[in-house]
């Protein structure tokens, strides 16, 4: 989908450029170009008898992410195994997740490894639904067709769902749990999206360092009667 952009970026680099690995998708009309190695062919070159080098310490580096520059100049951030593990386990607890959930990946992997939700699915034996194009119709279709129960996204995603046209929407029976972060969602957006079948939890963290370490765990007995502005502020 972004092959031409990647090729142009590599051509504009000084020195040795990264190796491009294609992930073709015939169903989405993105066949292999034949100019680069494909992901499956790359895996086939691996040694099945290779002995893994497991980390000796939980503070060892796990991943290198590059931020999008939303809170400053783009920068590379290293995440350690301990941090990713704690974030993953914390989400499972706060979302009260059970075995075999269905999660839709909307947050990019370069944002704290997709808020570490990527590793949450193998832990629970769940299904990871990937959304190639972040549009209202694509999200509604995934929820209705794949029975998605969880996803995370910025308030712009919530606005997209609230303002979707009738022909972009789909009916679904389950309540979808949503984490939102990046900016405070508008009170009107929160009110409207709850009526559509989404239960939104506001979270806060730093893309540059860790993830959504602070969550607003809703207490309906204390705040259930609050008006829209107060609910949004909480």
Model-derived regions: residue spans:
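Conserved AMP-binding/adenylation subdomain of ANL enzymes
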Residues: 85-102, 110-149, 164
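Conserved S/T- and glycine-rich ATP-binding loop of Class I adenylate-forming
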Residues: 61, 67-70, 103, 109, ...
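Gly/Ser/Thr-rich phosphate-binding loop
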Residues: 37-43, 123, 148-153, 162-234
